[in-house]
Amino acid sequence: VYPGGKSVNVTRVLKSLGIPVHLIGIAGRENIDLLRGLLDRDGIDYRLLETAGAVRENITVITPDRRAFTVNRQGIPIEKQAWDQLFISVQKELVPDGENLVVFAGSLPPNISAAEYKRLILSIRRPNVKIALDTDFFSFSQIREIAPFVIKPNMKEAENILSRSGITARDAFGAASLLAEA
């Protein structure tokens, strides 16, 4: 058993590279202590805000021929108090006189709209804050408005962003060029 998800994985990689990193997240209080224990075991610096429900648990099965099958369960709704506290927590972590890189990664909670998530991101936009996105729920126009420093879509995520299927690498590069011009 190990903690995962895009945000935890980004945190783990940055830590392995010797980059100071602090994870802020919202987790279900029913089994939050298990997650805290796993993060502590891995030496991850974190702040978890609590909401009703349980931390999502995903299952990966590796077959004898080394194929992997993953069952990703849906995330839990976020209580308004926890969502509001997230705004405050992210603001507090910013280094006022230094450079900041804030990574927003993972799926959209079922009761939070992309517009509301965008509002969180825009609330921290400053000259010394760089935004990185690894999500699949923003539209092309929303991404242009956010103007991230970096975005990391895979092909499926790029299809969501461009609102069409069957895109090519050329399509993705063309869209990236348009985003870079914004």
Region locations from a protein language model:
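Substrate-binding N-lobe of the ribokinase-like
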Residues: 1-56
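Short acidic/histidine-rich motifs immediately flanking catalytic phosphotransfer sites
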Residues: 96-101, 147
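Short beta-strands and strand-loop turn motifs
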Residues: 70-72, 99-107, 134, 152-157
